[in-house]
Regions:
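C-terminal motif of bacterial Sec signal peptides marking the signal peptidase cleavage site
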Residues: 17-20
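Acidic/His-rich structured neighborhood in mature extracellular/periplasmic domains
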Residues: 90-279
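Bacterial N-terminal signal peptides that target proteins for export
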Residues: 1-9
Length: 279
């Protein structure tokens, strides 16, 4: 659990860096029917541009997907500002790296069909509307990054980097990640991590440095407990939600929204006390 906890916190910090960005005139999701495909395949546009230089794909990346492209270029790849002269060529050059070129091809093969993930996310979002009505539904898309971050959040938009979910035996992973990390780099973790990081961005830690490890762990367990409810299964096992399971047994009338707000308020109390003591 500790390795996963560290990974989740690391991704959260990157998410919060992007949280203040503007996301244009995107329309919030209000409902999802059985035919909806809630995951938008931005990665397919990337592939078209990166493998063929298709100008129409580039135009769509810089219009329909302007926020996603800006987040990719400026915050994930960190290769400059999107509107800079020569940026189109710079993007192409960046992905000419042999490791990334191979990843593009492998992502294309592995994720040719994402029906299972779409269905899993659709179920989560429908449950979120009912169980967390005050939380705006995330706008989820897929992308190809550079093996640095699995999930990025920009306000309501959540980007899933598919190159981080190619399976524990993917050759590149063995060079950079330990065995425990590789076990989590499978497509089964994609939607649970997506929902976890999005909820952490909506119910953040606050003053992270002044919060005890016990409070951090409890808040993460609260998020995982809620994600289990959204998934309709115990993806995060009892060992990872044991404290919250016990807490909810004593507070059976508490809603999921109340649980997350309670945990966040408890951390605020600790942060406030720490700040006062520091004066």
């Amino acid at each position: 659990m500790k390795k996963y906890l560290f990974s989740a916190i690391t991704v959260l910090f990157v998410s919060l860096v992007l949280a203040g960005c503007s996301y244009g005139d995107g329309t919030p999701i209000s409902s999802l029917d059985d035919s909806s495909m809630p995951i938008r395949r931005y990665d397919l546009l990337q592939m078209r541009y990166l493998t063929t230089g298709d100008y129409s794909a580039l135009q769509k990346m810089r219009s329909t997907y302007i926020v996603e492209t800006r987040a990719l270029v400026e915050s994930l790849l960190k290769i400059g500002v999107l509107g800079e002269s020569g940026m189109n060529e710079r993007i192409l050059e960046y992905y000419e790296d042999s490791t990334l070129s191979a990843a593009i091809e492998d992502v294309n093969k592995t994720f040719a069909n994402m029906d299972k993930e779409n269905e899993q996310l659709r179920i989560c979002l429908n449950r979120m509307q009912r169980l967390l009505p005050e939380v705006e539904l995330p706008d989820v898309y897929t992308q190809i990054g550079d093996f640095e971050q699995s999930i990025v959040v920009c306000g309501r938009k959540v980007g899933i980097s598919l190159e981080k979910y190619l399976g524990p035996d993917y050759p590149v992973y063995k060079r950079f990640f330990d065995e425990q990390q590789r076990k989590q780099m499978t497509r089964e973790y994609m939607i649970p991590e997506c929902m976890s990081i999005y909820l952490l961005s909506q119910f953040p830690f606050g003053d992270f440095q002044n919060i005890s490890q016990a409070k951090r762990d409890f808040h993460l367990q609260c998020v995982w407990y809620v994600v289990n409810k959204l998934l309709g299964e115990e993806f995060f096992g009892r060992s990872e939600t044991s404290k919250v399971d016990a807490f909810m047994q004593m507070h059976k009338d508490m809603s999921l929204s109340e649980l997350l707000n309670y945990s966040r308020q408890e951390m605020s109390k600790v942060s406030g006390a720490s700040a006062e003591n520091a004066k």
